[in-house]
Amino acid sequence: MNWQTFENVWDALEDDPVKRENYKIRSELMITLAEHIENTYKNQTEAAKALGVTQPRISALKRGAFNEFRLDMLVDMALRAGLRVTVNVKAD
């Protein structure tokens, strides 16, 4: 059997490089938001109110329901949470 190693799970799962990079960025935002929510708010209801979403959206985020979140939605939530979002664009 031939084993391959990948730097990121999306490198293994997605062949399309455009989708793969989008997935990586969304994953990073979701992880950061979930950690921030866990460390900042008393409960999901409080987090939802602060982030301008419903409690079920917070639950979906914490469950890692990846396909339920667009990149712009995650950026909006991060900014409402007081997080700083930066973009680093570079040519390959």
Feature roles, as predicted:
Residues 51-67:
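Recognition helix of helix-turn-helix/homeodomain-like DNA-binding domains
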Residues 1-32:
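N-terminal flexible/basic segments that precede or flank functional cores
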Residues 31-50:
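Short basic helix-loop element that most often maps to the first helix and adjoining turn
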Residues 71-87:
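DNA major-groove recognition helix of helix-turn-helix/homeodomain DNA-binding modules
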Residues 20-24, 28, 42, 68, ...:
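Residues at secondary-structure transition points
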Residues 43-44, 55, 74:
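Helix-turn-helix DNA-binding elements, focusing on the entry/boundary residues of the two helices
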Residues 89-92:
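Short, charged recognition helix plus adjacent turn
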Residues 42, 53, 83:
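Short glycine/serine/threonine/alanine-rich loop segments
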